[in-house]
Each structure stands twice: as C-alpha cells, then as structure tokens.
Amino acid sequence: MTEAGDGVVKGDGYAVAALDDLGEGYGFRKIRKGLGVTAFGANAIVLPPGYETGSHLHEEQEELYFVHAGRVAFEFGDGSTHELEAGSFAWVDAPTVRKIRNLSDSEDAVYVIVGGKDGYVGRDGKLPPGETSRFGDNAPPGA
C-alpha cells in the first residue's frame, strides 16, 4: 500500500480517498486522475450556492449523475427542468444539452459524474475462492 498524497491511499488494485483529498474549493474534483481510474470518466463537482453551470453536451460520452449533497435543478435541451435532492440520479445521453443549478442560497451542492461511451456493459463479477456470498455472514434482508 502506498500513500498518493493529500490523503489518497493506493493499494494493489484499489485506491480510496475522501472528496477533500481530491481538491479544494469549488468546481471539479478529478476522481479519475486522483484514484487512477482508467475504464471510465469520473468527477465530483462542488457547486456554490445559487451557481449555475454552463450548458454542455458530448459527442460520444453519456453521463450518470449522482447528487451527493444539496438540491440541484437539471435543465435539458428540450426545455424541461427537474429538481433532484441528495441521493438522486440522472442519466443524460451524450448529445443531450444539459446545465445544472444549485437551488440553495446558502449551501454547496455536490454531485458525482460518471461518464463513458457505448461499449461493454455486462456482469462479470465473481466470488473469490472459498467465498460463498457477496456479503459474507452479514447479508442484508432480501440479498
């Protein structure tokens, strides 16, 4: 296990970090670069109270957004607006115009964006030798 600086810990086949380990202030926190992700794009955004991003779209990359903290409004190219609270997701296809606004006048909003282009999507997870459950002895109800 090695320390990657600023609290990012990298081990053999993994990396862990807190949001603040990936940067300070408002704007982008580069999850992909900070943790060494290579299979997809990943960023966290810290959006100040009342702030709105510019509109943007992508040529190939669809994006999945997860609102971690606060309340935001997504405005799409078709003119629709959707308010999302912490714990909510939004998927946006590559060519769809989008912009995001922090609905609070006093609190930051934090959201995570995971992006990638069409390709392999499948389930290839498996249990390591000797394991019989993904949850060990602590399986949640219904798992």
Each language-model region and where it sits:
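A generic "binding-loop/recognition-motif" signal
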Residues: 60, 80, 96-97, 117
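A short, N-terminal "cap"/entry segment at the start of jelly-roll beta-barrel domains
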Residues: 1-39, 54, 122-143
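A short hydrophobic beta-strand segment most commonly corresponding to one strand
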Residues: 91, 106-121
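Asparagine-centered strand-capping/turn motif at beta-strand->loop junctions
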Residues: 101-104
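Short acidic-glycine-tyrosine-enriched beta hairpin
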Residues: 78-94
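Conserved short histidine dyad/triad with adjacent acidic residue
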Residues: 28-30, 43-59
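Glycine- and acidic-residue-biased ligand/ion/polar-headgroup-sensing regions
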Residues: 60-62, 66-72
